[in-house]
Design a protein with these regions (language model features):
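Bacterial N-terminal signal peptides that target proteins for export
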Residues: 1-7, 90
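The canonical Cys-X-X-Cys-His
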Residues: 31, 35-46, 105, 109
Length: 124
């Protein structure tokens, strides 16, 4: 009986929103590190990154070329592009980017952002 009560308590704690938010923050933090290691070489800030340059040409300023600035990406979209590749971007096998790592990268790229409709702080 004590085991059942302990298991139930553990499930309730794991189901709490605070726990889910902490787990998501951990995935986002891991995803940021993985993105910097695996993706930023092509999709990072600065001149000469082929992924960013290609997206600048494709979108012509209508959508951010820097993936980290996009707010319209879904986890499914990130997974499709990484697994299938597109244009000059190669596909990545599960031996190159594991499913768990890809989930973390997707969590980072689709993380909630502060609302851009919030008023700017007044100048000092």
């Amino acid at each position: 009986m004590k085991t059942i009560a302990s298991a139930t308590l553990a499930l309730l704690l794991l189901a709490r929103p605070e726990t889910a938010n902490a787990q998501n923050r951990t995935a986002v933090d891991a995803g940021r590190d993985l993105y910097q290691y695996s993706c930023a070489i092509c999709h990072g800030r600065g001149p000469g990154n082929p992924g960013t340059v290609a997206l600048q040409a494709k979108y012509g300023g209508k959508s951010p070329a820097l993936l980290e600035d996009r707010t319209d990406l879904t986890a499914a979209t990130v997974r499709v592009f990484v697994r299938r590749g597109v244009s000059i971007m190669p596909f990545f096998r599960k031996t190159e980017v594991s499913d768990a790592d890809l989930d973390a990268i997707a969590a980072y790229l689709t993380r909630p952002r502060a609302s851009s409709s919030a008023p700017a702080a007044p100048p000092r």
